[in-house]
Swiss-Prot record:
Any matching Pfam family: RNA_pol_Rpb5_C
Subunit structure: Part of the RNA polymerase complex.
UniProt record similarity statement: Belongs to the archaeal Rpo5/eukaryotic RPB5 RNA polymerase subunit family.
Organism: Methanococcus maripaludis (strain C5 / ATCC BAA-1333)
Documented EC number(s): 2.7.7.6
Protein name: DNA-directed RNA polymerase subunit Rpo5
PROSITE patterns referenced in this protein's UniProt entry, alphabetically: RNA_POL_H_23KD
Places the protein is found: Cytoplasm
GO biological process: transcription by RNA polymerase II; transcription elongation by RNA polymerase I; tRNA transcription by RNA polymerase III
Record's keyword annotation contains Transferase: yes
Disulphide bond pairs: none
GO cellular-component term (any): cytoplasm
Amino acid sequence: MKVSSHEMVPTHEIIPREEIPLLLEKYDIKLQQLPKLLDTDPLVLEVEATPGDVLKITRMSPTAGETTYYRLVIATSP
Protein backbone atom coordinates (compact mmCIF):
# COMPACT_ATOMS: atom_id res chain seq x y z
CA MET A 1 0.00 0.00 0.00
CA LYS A 2 1.23 3.47 -0.87
CA VAL A 3 1.26 5.60 2.27
CA SER A 4 0.61 8.74 0.21
CA SER A 5 -2.68 7.36 -1.09
CA HIS A 6 -4.36 7.80 2.30
CA GLU A 7 -6.57 10.91 2.40
CA MET A 8 -5.04 12.14 5.67
CA VAL A 9 -1.44 12.12 4.38
CA PRO A 10 -0.29 15.49 3.02
CA THR A 11 1.53 15.84 -0.29
CA HIS A 12 5.32 15.39 -0.09
CA GLU A 13 7.63 16.50 -2.90
CA ILE A 14 11.38 16.94 -3.20
CA ILE A 15 12.56 20.52 -3.70
CA PRO A 16 15.20 20.74 -6.47
CA ARG A 17 18.66 21.19 -4.88
CA GLU A 18 19.22 24.47 -6.74
CA GLU A 19 16.08 25.94 -5.10
CA ILE A 20 17.17 25.17 -1.51
CA PRO A 21 19.34 28.33 -1.16
CA LEU A 22 16.37 30.44 -2.31
CA LEU A 23 14.14 28.82 0.32
CA LEU A 24 16.70 29.42 3.06
CA GLU A 25 17.13 33.04 2.00
CA LYS A 26 13.36 33.60 1.87
CA TYR A 27 12.95 32.50 5.50
CA ASP A 28 16.38 33.79 6.64
CA ILE A 29 17.37 30.42 8.09
CA LYS A 30 20.19 27.89 7.81
CA LEU A 31 19.64 24.39 6.40
CA GLN A 32 20.12 22.75 9.81
CA GLN A 33 17.31 24.91 11.27
CA LEU A 34 14.69 23.10 9.19
CA PRO A 35 12.67 20.42 10.98
CA LYS A 36 14.14 16.98 10.32
CA LEU A 37 12.71 13.86 8.73
CA LEU A 38 14.55 10.52 8.90
CA ASP A 39 15.54 8.75 5.71
CA THR A 40 13.65 5.68 6.98
CA ASP A 41 10.30 7.50 7.08
CA PRO A 42 7.79 5.66 4.84
CA LEU A 43 7.00 8.78 2.80
CA VAL A 44 10.69 9.63 2.37
CA LEU A 45 11.19 6.14 0.97
CA GLU A 46 8.13 6.47 -1.25
CA VAL A 47 9.29 9.73 -2.87
CA GLU A 48 12.85 8.34 -3.04
CA ALA A 49 14.38 11.23 -1.09
CA THR A 50 17.91 10.94 0.27
CA PRO A 51 19.77 12.67 3.12
CA GLY A 52 20.28 16.33 2.24
CA ASP A 53 17.03 16.60 0.29
CA VAL A 54 14.40 19.08 1.42
CA LEU A 55 10.77 18.01 1.21
CA LYS A 56 7.92 20.42 0.64
CA ILE A 57 4.87 19.20 2.54
CA THR A 58 1.51 20.68 1.58
CA ARG A 59 -1.37 20.18 4.00
CA MET A 60 -5.00 21.19 3.78
CA SER A 61 -6.42 22.91 6.84
CA PRO A 62 -10.11 23.66 7.43
CA THR A 63 -9.18 27.01 9.01
CA ALA A 64 -6.07 28.12 7.10
CA GLY A 65 -6.69 26.53 3.71
CA GLU A 66 -3.45 25.22 2.25
CA THR A 67 -0.30 25.34 4.39
CA THR A 68 3.26 24.49 3.37
CA TYR A 69 6.02 23.05 5.53
CA TYR A 70 9.60 22.15 4.68
CA ARG A 71 11.69 19.37 6.22
CA LEU A 72 15.29 18.28 5.80
CA VAL A 73 15.88 14.57 5.22
CA ILE A 74 18.64 13.26 7.49
CA ALA A 75 20.35 9.88 7.73
CA THR A 76 19.33 7.49 10.46
CA SER A 77 22.09 7.06 13.04
CA PRO A 78 23.92 3.74 12.67
